[in-house]
Amino acid sequence: MKSDIQICRDTALTPIDQIALMAGIEPQDLTPQGTLKAKVKPSILNRLADKPEGKLVLVTAITPTPLGEGKTVTTIGLAQGLAKINKRVIACIRQPSMGPVFGVKGGAAGGGYSQVAPMEKLNLHLTGDIHAVTAAHNLAAAALDARLYHEERHGYEAFSDKTGLPALRIDIKNIVWKRVMDHNDRALRMITVGKNEAGKAINGLEREDGFDISAASEIMAILALSKDLADMRQRIGRVVLAYNIDGNPITAEDLQVAGAMTVTMCEAIEPTLMQTLEGVATLIHAGPFANIAHGNSSIIADRIALKLSEFTVTEGGFGSDMGFEKACNIKAQQADRGPDCAVVVATLRGLKANSGLYDLRPGQALPDAIFSPDEKALIAGFDNLKWHIRNAAQYGLPVVVAINRFPQDTDVELELLKNMVADTDFSTYVGVAISEAFGKGGEGATELAQAVVKACETPANFKPLYSLSQSLEEKLMAVAEVGYGARSIELSDCAKEQLATLKKHGHDNLAVCLAKTPLSITTDPGIKGAPSDFVVPVRELKLCAGAGFVYALCGNVMTMPGLPEKPAYMNLDIDADGNIVGLS
């Protein structure tokens, strides 16, 4: 089979203005960015206000291997499959970060014959939204350090007399806003800024700082959760950058930088329209990771797609304990709109990896045996799929299991897994279909599409795990105990102090976003299957007042990834004709 990029390159694509018209997007709603991608103006929602909404299908997965289990392939394949059975459909996905593109996973455009195209445009820069997020975020960081420098240089009273501005009295030891970049770079996790030559202070005040990856930026979360430009402006103003010497928060509004940050983001708020290899309209917008952020594409893109189509297919990052949980408890509560159906992607290799019969270690390649027939391991790993089905169902949703077929998979094991799903009593609607979207495109996903249409005939009774009116502790416990199946949570001394500060400043009404490993339902990546009776350790709590959640760092999760020993960038090059090679 040809490589992903070769398949994409060999496929004749439709001009984006025609894709837009077929989807119901008129020329005045569109800002073309060349012939194969365009920005869609959020003002389209004014024209579509009276149109009914279609069904929202949320794709999730079992606990994945580091290779991923084909969730984006399934999302794109399902959209193409729905189009094959004559349903109006739009897919909504996140913009890929260049960190994973150059790191371990490679691109995030799907694969095989279920891709968003051109895949190299999607995976590398696209329309620059992530760069806009990075610029807006780092503008706030630069403004904060500049204000700190000038206030300390002059003294608070003299600074106010000179500028007419109130002194913010920034506590240099309580600055919470790091810088960001769209690369994996572990060397930048802990740095010192403001270093000067002896006797000089022209470079600012020396302090400890660090970088996160742009996908973990609160500005990225704000982009994904804003309803419109005015909402984004207000949210950016609420971002807390530091605390003053009295312990009170200093916001982007206080620093008078929120307006400029929003100006930097004014085009990023427009979703980007592209197409699948079969000409299905796809909206790409925002790119928060699901392990260290909330892991879903934007509310704006969903709202546009729901008004234009019978079915909107979107995805939450990693397994149902990750992006799916955050879609249901964060995104849905802010959008006032829950999904109508959950699709759980499962693979033979992924279930075998969760069997407990293989010695799997983080950072090491999967053993060759896991790709070979092994019914014992498949049966043992089935507990993980059952866990994810029941987890999705507890939100009141009908569930469809999509068994994503790989070339090495045998018919015997695929049918065994399909029968195990069909023969298990889940006390809710659970459909199952084998998806061959990777190798056959939409034609290979029509069985899955029909199963999803049938599932959506069952009315959803969507209900998040918690109400925003509950306390932060109750919300953390709800996610850990109900969302993960843990026995309890355990707050570090640092987290307890931060919790008290959050309550003091009136942030008890925010959602919670738990950052943890995606490779286990627990916070330990080495624990596979469907564990229970474990504790979720919360080491740190961070306020994301603009995004509307409190960020809980659990276990050893890092907000700036590092590159592996053999990164994916080693495979990338460009030929004499300007064609990119090695991107997957």
Curated annotation (Swiss-Prot):
| GO function terms (MF aspect) | ATP binding; formate-tetrahydrofolate ligase activity
Which EC numbers characterise this protein's activity in its record? Answer: 6.3.4.3
State which pathway it belongs to.
One-carbon metabolism; tetrahydrofolate interconversion
Please report a single Pfam family linked to this protein: FTHFS
Q: Could you tell me the keywords of this UniProt record? A: ATP-binding, Ligase, Nucleotide-binding, One-carbon metabolism
**InterPro entries to which the protein is assigned, alphabetical:** Formate_THF_ligase, Formate_THF_ligase_CS, P-loop_NTPase
Listed under catalytic activity are: (6S)-5,6,7,8-tetrahydrofolate + formate + ATP = (6R)-10-formyltetrahydrofolate + ADP + phosphate
Which GO annotations describe the biological process of this protein? tetrahydrofolate interconversion
Root EC class? ligase
Which parts of the sequence bind ATP?
T65, P66, L67, G68, E69, G70, K71, T72
HAMAP family reported in the protein's UniProt record:
FTHFS
Q: Report the sequence similarity comment from the record.
A: Belongs to the formate--tetrahydrofolate ligase family.
Which named protein is this? Formate--tetrahydrofolate ligase
- Gene symbol? fhs
